[in-house]
Amino acid sequence: TSNDFNTEGVKQFCHLLDSRQQADIFQQDLLHLYLNAQNELSTRALNTASIGAGATGVELAAELVTAKENFYKYGLNKIDPKKVKISIIEAADRILPALSQKVADHTMKQLSHFGIEVLTKHRVAKVDEDKIYFADGSNIEADLKVWAAGIKAPDVLTQLEGFEKDNIGRLKVFA
């Protein structure tokens, strides 16, 4: 289950990717974003943001690069792929904290090559319909936002007694 850390606006304005149904809704909203932009009189920049730079956030951003190119190829050509900004936002000082520094460094080079903006050391304080606000007072615009910043155990596990749990409520398993 996603852990929003009680960040204001996440539940209302961010997509979660905990289930196939949530992923399908994200896909539909991404397509609607492009279709609506295609039908606007003036072209504008589209901004997407993945909040969280673990495996989910990084992979999603990379897939959005392919998606923007495919949308253009398949007829949504009023939207210049160069005007589609893809951002990854991470509170920690680097991406992919569960992996080695070498893997993170290589991935950063690839993300840069794809034109993905990576903001590390940016803790999200609040999200609204149009923007993501950071603890330092700065903000960025984002039409479509995905919260991939952390996980926690399902709430049902809090009711289980007699089992040892870690700091985010997951059951400890001893093999």
Which sequence ranges carry the predicted segments?
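FAD-site-proximal beta/loop scaffold in flavoenzymes
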Residues: 13-39, 131, 140-144, 148-175
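Short amphipathic alpha-helical segments
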Residues: 5-9, 62-63, 100-101, 157-161
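Glycine-rich dinucleotide-binding loop and its adjacent helix/turn
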Residues: 3-56, 63-70
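Short, flexible hinge/linker loops that cap or flank conserved catalytic cores
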Residues: 40-42, 80, 139
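A conserved short coil-to-beta-strand element within the FAD-binding core of flavoproteins
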Residues: 120-133
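Rossmann-like dinucleotide-binding cores of NAD(P)H-dependent redox enzymes
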Residues: 63-122
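Short, well-ordered coil/turn residues at beta-beta hairpins
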Residues: 1, 135, 148-149
